[in-house]
Amino acid sequence: MKIDRGGNAHVVMFLSSLFVFGGIVVDAISYDHTAIIRCLANPPKPQYKGGIVVNPEMNDGLRGWTVYGGVKIEHRVSPKGNNFIVAHSRTNPYGSVSQKVSLDKDKLYTFSAWIQVSGRKSTVQAIFKSNDGYKPAGSVEAQVGCWSMLKGGITVGSSGPAEFYFQTNDTSVDIWVDSVSLQPFTQEEWRSHQDQNTEKVRKSMVKLQVVNSKGKPIPHANISITLKNANFPFGASINQNIVNNVAYQNWFTSRFTVTTFENEMKWYSTETSQGKEDYSKADSMLDFATKHGILVRGHNIFWEDPKYQMGWVNNLSPNDLQVATDRRLNSVVSRYAGKVIAWDVNNENLHFNYFESKLGANITDIFFQKTGQLDKHATLFMNDYNTIEEQGDADSSPSRYLQKLKELYSYLGGAVKLGIGLESHFTVPNIPYVRSTLDILAASRLPIWITELDVKRGDNQILYFEQILREVHSHPGVQGIVMWGPWSPQGEQCYNLCLVDPNFKNLPAGDVVDKVLKEWGRHNKEVVATTDAEGFVNLSLLHGDFGVTLQHQKNSQSFKVDARYSGQTIKIIA
């Protein structure tokens, strides 16, 4: 048997999307992933024509809008005819314009608005006041003289009236508002978006034809198609126990294709005492991963959080610290260059500044530059928390994250490949906010990875875990997922979320992982199909590498499924 990839009469591998919604066709409002991170002279039309917002473009003056917080508001028209509302004479952070809406606890709401401020740039939040209290829906670093898109989302615990408004701590600035949208989606619609994206982004509809050596179709032929390797990296962190634990190895390699070492590559593990390096644990773990074709993320070179610095590091003078960090970076990156796919260069530098406070504000830029010089193939990531987990954390908001990336890019001049690392340690996920934030970050066109996914313990931990897992996997901008701390030899003493018990029997979270792997086609590594009367078979397959074998034949041939191969001709010749 051979696979013919050329010729005009051959069968085309169609890569059009097949939309499957758990067996149910859902007539859903399409979700708009558009996010604009440039500041514009004039705002675009509101998404979803404003959704349930009254007078979203302010074309009818102040209709539907009211004062919030004792400020003054007025309707204005720009020289080019754009209508907007300005909140001025502000004396408190929450003084702005507002609108009352009714929210349903069973729906998910995506929110967007275009914001401008006077005087100087300022972080502006959208706040929803409801029976649940005050909840931020998103924020943006608003500019002077141009419009910035604020995109976010909200859910509520109880149905009823609500009111949204805008706030900034800088009371000296006026807040300008235009093109506001609040669009509700049902749970079924939201899930249909995930299913559509999974089929469109992670899979392709493949049409194969089996023919004999003379090109004649072979009807009713039984073929076996085997997934050899899925393109999308999906995995979990590992610890040193995996090196000598066969059960651990079997459990991991049967499910995952990428990993991060939980501690063994970190500075406090490789140089506990000054000048005495020990990479034996990390080396053994890397050998295991390489043997089994598991991709490895380098985590991490430095960690800005002061509480994770060793005593001997804390005792160094600035000059000695510079020497020590140079040695550390050169040592770990040179050792593993070409063996890891990525580096978390200076972990959590949006929240902490241990090295920046001692070695200069641009030390992160220098760390990235030196890492890129030593390892020219790896993607260099920022890695931080609360960008998608908590919409109220100003330190790691989407705007703040993108600003830091912009500073890095400006310093590096495009000399290295940058990536967006989102730790994703969730408590109660705000799913619409997660999707909107991923939209914003994806507008940078940089690869996004979910690097340390888990959910804190609680009554709804497993429900939330499945929700967030489906959401991030289905987003077009996400290019890899690593779950954090899935196993502990001490029982359910994982960092937050155990997938299995000490004997590698599934816990509820492990059942979730196996369920979605099966749905996504990663557990169904072998698919048996029968050709029709014309020798054709149609399958929706993951992007990845496959082998195909005809019944009663031993030889297997390989083919690739990838969106880039649209229009490629494939013929299976018996």
Regions found by a protein language model. Give the residues of each.
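Extracellular and organelle-lumenal recognition/adhesion modules and their flexible linkers in secreted
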Residues: 4-238, 242-255, 315-316, 375-378, ...
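Aromatic-rich peripheral "rim/lid" segments of glycoside hydrolase catalytic domains that contact
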Residues: 37, 66, 188-193, 197-199, ...
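Conserved residues at the C-terminal ends of beta-strands
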Residues: 183, 262, 346, 423, ...
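Noncatalytic carbohydrate-binding groove/subsite architecture in carbohydrate-active enzymes
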Residues: 218, 237-249, 354-460
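Structural preference for beta-strand elements that scaffold enzyme active sites
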Residues: 233-235, 257-260, 293-297, 340-344, ...
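Short amphipathic alpha-helices and their capping/turn segments at secondary-structure boundaries
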Residues: 243-254, 280-292, 330-335, 369, ...
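Substrate-binding cleft and catalytic face of glycoside hydrolase catalytic domains
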Residues: 258-272, 281-389
